[in-house]
């Protein structure tokens, strides 16, 4: 891999390119996460229980698919274009097309055919997204092996999602709804815009991000023993900690996001108020981006995540018993909690890279693709559970999906209890897992990286 020797040094261009890559993924994946269930229930008039089952089944299959793709990526030798970038470049095109097809209004066809169309477009999109996201997530581990640069990449990656969520929370409710009712054609129009912008961002990532860390290639004829690697991964406490921490935290955050529109539409009585939250979230996002790395450097990634997310969990535990009916007051409280919990979202990718290093420390092999895709499996599992759970919650509380329906007082109160209760449990359990399972404190991370550098230097000197 001699071409690696002439690659330019790590720079701001890499950080911006990686930000754009995450933004590109979010343009399709997060748009779907925010509005596809709403599109299914309110536009296609599909029973929330049926939507929940569909999402659960397809997401579990998609999660199983992640380690398979990771193993395929690991088994392929690097080409002139790199090991991971060619995957992103090629599969981002069909992924964009499938994102658009998911928002085609098929509400007038037979109910069974409607479900079949939803299933096919959902499964195909997620398969293509995996072929983009697994190589993209692994890419940061070969862009640099410097700990501060990796933390910066994790921070800049989170910025991509933050930019998307900030803009979409402001634009979505204002554009997609007229007189508090969803408009089918606007969902498709926004899907087209998101798909094209996402494709553009990912193609820029392929040009601006460079692979620098030499990945040892397997000897000729030696095959990757997938089951052996999985057995080794099962002893990786760092990966186990970050997987289960992310699993529970993501379930909490995703269910809350899934109920967000219903909270503003039915509990507060005006879905457009959600746009105010989006505008204020710009300030919170800027503050989070500014403070997270200094706080992580001072206290450690694990330590700051526990403190911030723990604070947010306690606040929402109190809100469960004491509802806030003033939307402005709620938005402010929610924003303060976001600052606390944001460390978990910003630093998670740096912690995954640390888990890859921990795997190398234990086994002498990196296997970035499988390690990352195993983590991605748990993220997809969390997405499956949370995406289904928000729909199951709506079905369980008796939410009426009929166009223009007014929800009963009991349903409206249940939306609040579900929103705050899931937030408290999700983040509370996540903090406990991180504290008791994840071993890499600030000191232990520094010791691990020192040991790995010494080992690599010894290998190069032979």
Regions found by a protein language model. Name each.
Residues 2-462:
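Membrane-embedded alpha-helical bundles of multi-pass transporters/translocases
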């Amino acid at each position: 891999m001699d071409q690696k020797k002439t690659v330019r040094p790590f720079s701001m261009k890499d950080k911006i390119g990686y930000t754009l890559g995450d933004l590109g993924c979010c343009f399709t994946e997060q748009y779907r996460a925010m509005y596809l269930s709403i599109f299914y229930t309110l536009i296609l008039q599909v029973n929330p229980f049926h939507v929940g089952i569909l999402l659960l089944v397809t997401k579990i299959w998609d999660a199983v698919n992640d380690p398979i793709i990771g193993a395929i990526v690991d088994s392929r030798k690097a080409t002139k274009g790199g090991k991971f970038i060619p995957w992103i470049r090629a599969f981002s095109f069909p992924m964009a097309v499938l994102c658009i097809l998911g928002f085609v209004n098929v509400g007038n066809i037979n109910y069974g055919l409607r479900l079949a169309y939803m299933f096919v477009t959902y499964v195909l999109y997620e398969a293509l997204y995996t072929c983009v996201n697994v190589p993209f997530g692994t890419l940061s581990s070969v862009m640099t092996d410097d700990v501060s640069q990796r933390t910066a990449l994790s921070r800049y990656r989170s910025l991509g999602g933050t930019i998307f969520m900030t803009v979409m929370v402001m634009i979505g409710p204002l554009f997609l709804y007229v007189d508090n009712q969803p408009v089918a054609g606007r969902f498709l129009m926004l899907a087209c815009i998101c798909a094209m912008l996402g494709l553009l961002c990912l193609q820029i990532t392929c040009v601006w991000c460079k692979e620098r860390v030499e990945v040892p290639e397997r000897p000729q004829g030696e095959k990757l023993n997938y089951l052996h690697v999985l057995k080794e991964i099962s002893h990786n406490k760092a990966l186990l900690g970050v997987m289960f921490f992310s699993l529970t935290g993501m379930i909490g955050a995703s269910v809350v996001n899934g109920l967000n529109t219903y909270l503003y539409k039915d509990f507060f009585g005006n879905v457009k108020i959600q746009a105010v939250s989006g505008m204020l979230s710009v300030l919170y996002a800027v503050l989070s981006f500014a403070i997270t790395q200094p706080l992580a450097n001072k206290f450690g990634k694990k330590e700051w995540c526990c403190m911030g997310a723990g604070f947010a969990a306690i606040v929402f535990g109190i809100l469960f018993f004491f509802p806030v009916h003033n939307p402005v007051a709620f938005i402010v409280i929610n924003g303060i909690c976001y600052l606390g919990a944001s460390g978990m979202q910003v630093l998670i990718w740096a912690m995954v890279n640390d888990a890859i290093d921990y795997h190398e420390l234990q086994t002498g092999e990196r296997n970035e693709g499988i390690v990352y895709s195993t983590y991605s499996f748990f993220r997809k599992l969390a997405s499956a559970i949370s995406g289904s759970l928000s729909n199951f919650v709506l079905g369980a509380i008796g939410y009426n999906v009929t166009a223009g329906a007014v929800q009963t007082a009991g349903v409206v109160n249940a939306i609040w209890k579900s929103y705050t209760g899931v937030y408290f449990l999700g983040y509370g359990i996540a903090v406990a897992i991180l504290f008791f399972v994840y071993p890499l404190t600030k000191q232990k991370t520094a010791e691990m990286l020192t040991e790995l550098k010494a080992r690599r230097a010894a290998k190069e000197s032979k």
